[in-house]
Amino acid sequence: MKPVYRCRVCSAYTEEPVHCGRPAEPLMTGEQRLRLSKLMTTLLRHLPHEAGLRLDPQGWVGIDELVRGIRERWRNRHLYQWVTRDHVIAVALLDPKGRFQLDLARGRIRAAYGHTVRVELGYRPLSMDELPDKLYHGTVAENLASILSEGLKPMRRLMVHMTTDYSSAVETGRRHGPNVVVLVIDPRCLAKHGIPVYRASDTIYLAPSVPPNCITGKIARNPQSARKTYLHA
């Protein structure tokens, strides 16, 4: 990830070393940013108790409480003594996938999606007019038979995750193995089946499940090249 700077003029967090015409103040290296982002994701989605955090029913926790938990309670806290409120806010604001939501007026933060701990995010179901034309979900060929038979299920998460960004779906699939398959999903089909679709960030959408007949296409990725192979739906 890119390093993060703070503008000496407007105080904005930025990935650019020059902002408002002046050299910006270094805040985090790219390595520090990546490590902190992964830790924040782990604590806010899956393991808040391991840093002594108590999420509210909607998944929010105080920013200062998160910083204290990381520095005082997390098992590898000796690696994170540099973390301050500014670092947490900067990671959240600059996250390229919108993984975090900030409520600075109340001094709190939460994960926008991806939870395995039970939370009620309170997102509004999208209307037909608000739905994108198609969504993608990354998986691997080994999972295709069960998916095409039973559909997509949340598994350990609370919701099925889909994206409007094809490359992000490929990246997700690669986490599960080399034989990546990107599923094409019709969100209007979900709505017609009474399955709500929620928007969690600019590119991430959620649904409780995806039945097989709402999967309209499959795109296989050759692990040795960038070539796409369109499979029969």
Swiss-Prot record:
The keyword Metal-binding does not apply. The keyword Transferase applies. SUPFAM superfamilies: ADP-ribosylation. Transmembrane segments: none annotated. Keywords: NAD, Transferase. Its EC number is 2.7.1.-. InterPro entries: Ptrans_KptA/Tpt1 (IPR002745), RNA_2'-PTrans_C (IPR042081), RNA_2'-PTrans_KptA (IPR022928), RNA_2'-PTrans_N (IPR042080). PANTHER family: PUTATIVE PHOSPHOTRANSFERASE, TRNA 2'-PHOSPHOTRANSFERASE 1. Belongs to the KptA/TPT1 family. This is Probable RNA 2'-phosphotransferase. It comes from Hyperthermus butylicus (strain DSM 5456 / JCM 9403 / PLM1-5). The gene is kptA.
